[in-house]
Amino acid sequence: MQVNELGFLASLLFVLVPSVFLIVLYIQTASREAK
């Protein structure tokens, strides 16, 4: 099965972007509660 590079990149972004967003949101909340 040949992997479509653009499709692979799109799915990678589709997974990474929400994950990074959630991690940043969690860190902001944690640092806010720590103060």
UniProtKB/Swiss-Prot annotation:
GO terms for biological process: photosynthesis, light reaction. One of its GO terms (cellular component) is photosystem II. The keyword Transmembrane helix applies. InterPro entries: PSII_PsbM, PSII_PsbM_sf. It is found in: Cellular thylakoid membrane. It comes from the Bacteria. The keyword Thylakoid applies. It is a single-pass membrane protein. Keywords: Membrane, Photosynthesis, Photosystem II, Reaction center, Thylakoid, Transmembrane, Transmembrane helix. The chain crosses the membrane at residues 7-27. Belongs to the PsbM family. PSII is composed of 1 copy each of membrane proteins PsbA, PsbB, PsbC, PsbD, PsbE, PsbF, PsbH, PsbI, PsbJ, PsbK, PsbL, PsbM, PsbT, PsbX, PsbY, PsbZ, Psb30/Ycf12, peripheral proteins PsbO, CyanoQ (PsbQ), PsbU, PsbV and a large number of cofactors. It forms dimeric complexes. HAMAP family: PSII_PsbM (MF_00438). One of the components of the core complex of photosystem II (PSII). PSII is a light-driven water:plastoquinone oxidoreductase that uses light energy to abstract electrons from H(2)O, generating O(2) and a proton gradient subsequently used for ATP formation. It consists of a core antenna complex that captures photons, and an electron transfer chain that converts photonic excitation into a charge separation. This subunit is found at the monomer-monomer interface. This is Photosystem II reaction center protein M. It comes from Synechococcus elongatus (strain ATCC 33912 / PCC 7942 / FACHB-805) (Anacystis nidulans R2).
